[in-house]
Amino acid sequence: PMIYVGMMPLALAILFFFTKSIRLRSKFAFLGIIAFFVASFYLQALDLLWQGMHSPNMFLHRYAFLFSLLLVLMALETLSRWEEIKTWHILTISLFLITGFLDTLIFGHYKYVMTSQVMLTFLFGLAYLILSINSVRKWISAHLFVIILFVFMTVEAGVNALYQVQGIQKEWNFANRDY
C-alpha cells in the first residue's frame, strides 16, 4: 500500500513507545492496532474484511490512510510531550531508522529506488536529526523549531508526492491528453 507520513512523524511515532508519561496500556493498545493494520496488509482474509468482503478494483488497501493517521496521532502525542525527550532518545531512534532504511536498500530488492531518492532521504534525516538535537538541547527556541520543522516537512512531502506521481506515471502509463 502507498503509505506516507514523513520521516519526522515516523520517528516521533516510534518515540511514542519510549515516552515515560504515556501509560503502558496506551502503548500496548497502539501497538495492537498497528499489528492489526500490518496483518491486514498481508493477510487476504483481513484485507477482504476491510474491503467489505469483496475484492477491490484498482484501489488495493484503500484503508491504508488509517494507518498513516494512526502514526500521525502517535507523533502528535509524542510532540506534545517533547520536553521529556532526551538526546539519547533521538540518537537511538535515528540509529534504528538508519538501520531500517539500509536494511531495506540492501536486502529489499527495490529496483525502482534511485540514488537521488536515497540521498534526499539521508539529507532530510540529517536535517531532522540536527534540528531535533538543537531543540532538545534548547539551542533554538520552540517557535523557531516549529517553523523550521514545518518548512522541512512541507518540502519533504512535496518531493515525495512528486516522486510518487512520477512512479505511478511510469507504472500505469496515464493517457496522454495531447490530441
List where the protein language model places each region.
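Hydrophobic, aromatic-rich transmembrane alpha-helices
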Residues: 5-37, 128-133
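Hydrophobic alpha-helical transmembrane segments
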Residues: 2-15, 68-75, 123
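Contiguous transmembrane helix-bundle modules in multi-pass membrane proteins
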Residues: 31-37, 41, 45, 54, ...
